[in-house]
């Protein structure tokens, strides 16, 4: 009995390690994971970083690609290789994010903190942002340009920095990358293909115009290979026998017709690796001690969860009155061909239905209907077409419905306890109204 319990504990510990290794691989932009289809871009980036770290050259580059294309993973791999070179032990990294550093003052404080120069700056007063930044970089100098401490500035959500007032941060970073004594590399990450159009002329003139594009250009056979590699356990996994069985199961999954159908469907909707990781994470969550190996059913259920319509799910939790208002808006969309409408128009449509079917739906007072309408707006199922003025009446504010007919009908099919007359109203032709 004791040996069986020990064996069970060892099995549970083994699965716990599997979960930890794979979740870390799926959830983090780990520099230890493999790069897929971006070897040329990686070579370009690492070469540029080495020129800054080893030879004291200043450079600037933008990494451009859609969300989930691997921009951060690519950069993390390059930085990891750079930090393994003995010459660049003293390279300093400064990470900024457009969502966090919303203006140049906040950005400057963050730069000072990451450079560990708070005690140097103390109560000094600077005339401008440029003067302050130059002072920080001078504090890092060790004589000539080649012996000074290189600084790598990484700007995530680069396009948000481009929308900041006067683009002061970008101007000064690109300026020092051309003229400063301290070697500086400025690396921007963005999903905007038109990023150069957002830059002011003075900023653009100081940018090197180097761009590295990531476009997820792999085909389905490569996607299938990535699927196998991402699910496989590494050779150094402690329990060799379990790792062998796990990897054999992954190989069988990659040849299963049901799994291939799931992956093909997922690939056709979204081929980025972030989306694949989400699918694999949901399937991995179903692996337990009693169910130690992933199956095609797990992947099918994960695919179903990935493809759920969030807006349609919100509709499942609405009241019958709110459902009636959405159906009224659906008919208005059909009549006026997607033109905006207001509350009064929706209320009139609802009243037409009530007059015909008073026995099945309670006739709510107008303020109650208005409250339900406002709740739909809070849930972002409808949105105002234009900004509301203080003097405008709420009943006549123009709005648009953010659900299409298919979403409404699918949601109604799954809506429990919906009155039959309401369902019939939703499917009725315009002539019925």
Swiss-Prot record:
The modification N6-methyllysine is found at residue 7. InterPro entries: AAA+_ATPase (IPR003593), AAA_16 (IPR041664), ORC4 (IPR016527), ORC4_C (IPR032705), P-loop_NTPase (IPR027417). ATP binds at residues 65-72. It comes from the Eukaryota. GO terms for molecular function: ATP binding; ATP hydrolysis activity; DNA replication origin binding. Component of ORC, a complex composed of at least 6 subunits: ORC1, ORC2, ORC3, ORC4, ORC5 and ORC6. ORC is regulated in a cell-cycle dependent manner. It is sequentially assembled at the exit from anaphase of mitosis and disassembled as cells enter S phase. Interacts with DBF4. Interacts with POLQ. Binds histone H3 and H4 trimethylation marks H3K9me3, H3K27me3 and H4K20me3. Component of the origin recognition complex (ORC) that binds origins of replication. DNA-binding is ATP-dependent. The specific DNA sequences that define origins of replication have not been identified yet. ORC is required to assemble the pre-replication complex necessary to initiate DNA replication. This is Origin recognition complex subunit 4. It comes from Mus musculus (Mouse). The gene is Orc4.
């Amino acid at each position: 009995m004791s040996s069986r319990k020990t064996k069970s504990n060892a099995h549970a510990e083994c699965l716990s390690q599997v979960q930890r290794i794979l979740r870390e691989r799926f959830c983090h932009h780990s520099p230890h994971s493999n790069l897929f289809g971006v070897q040329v871009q990686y070579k370009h980036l690492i070469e540029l970083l080495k020129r800054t770290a080893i030879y004291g050259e200043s450079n600037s580059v933008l990494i451009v690609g859609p969300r989930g294309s691997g921009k951060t993973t690519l950069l993390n791999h390059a930085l990891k290789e750079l930090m393994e070179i003995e010459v660049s032990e003293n390279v300093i990294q400064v990470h900024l994010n457009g969502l966090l550093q919303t203006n140049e003052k906040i950005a400057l404080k963050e730069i000072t903190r990451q450079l560990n120069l708070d005690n140097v700056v103390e109560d000094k007063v600077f005339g401008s942002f440029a003067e302050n930044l130059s002072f920080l970089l001078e504090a890092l100098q060790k004589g000539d340009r080649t012996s000074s401490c290189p600084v790598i500035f990484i700007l995530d959500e680069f396009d948000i920095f481009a929308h900041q007032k006067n683009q002061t941060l970008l101007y000064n970073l690109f300026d020092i990358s051309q003229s400063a004594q301290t070697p500086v590399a400025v690396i921007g990450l963005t999903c905007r293909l038109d990023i150069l159009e957002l830059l002011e002329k003075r900023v653009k003139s100081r940018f090197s115009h180097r761009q590295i594009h990531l476009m997820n250009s792999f085909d389905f056979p490569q996607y299938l290979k990535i699927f196998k590699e991402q699910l496989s356990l590494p050779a150094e996994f402690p329990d060799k026998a379990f790792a062998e069985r796990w990897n054999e199961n992954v190989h069988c999954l990659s040849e299963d017709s049901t799994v291939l159908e799931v992956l093909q469907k997922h690939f056709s909707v979204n081929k980025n690796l972030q989306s694949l990781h989400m699918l694999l994470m949901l399937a991995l969550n179903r692996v337990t001690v009693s169910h130690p190996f992933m199956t095609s059913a797990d992947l099918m259920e994960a695919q179903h969860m990935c493809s759920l319509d969030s807006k349609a799910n919100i509709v499942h939790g609405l009241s019958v009155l709110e459902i009636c208002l959405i159906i009224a808006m659906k008919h208005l969309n059909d009549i006026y061909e997607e033109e905006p409408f207001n509350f009064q128009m929706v209320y009139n449509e609802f009243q037409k239905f009530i007059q015909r079917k008073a026995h099945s739906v309670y006739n709510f007072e107008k303020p109650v209907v208005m409250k339900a309408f406002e709740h739909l707006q809070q849930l972002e199922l409808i949105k105002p077409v234009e900004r509301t003025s203080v003097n405008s009446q709420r009943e006549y504010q123009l709005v648009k419905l953010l659900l299409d007919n298919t979403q409404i009908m699918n949601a109604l099919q799954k809506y429990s306890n919906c009155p039959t007359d309401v369902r019939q109203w939703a499917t009725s032709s315009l002539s019925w109204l």
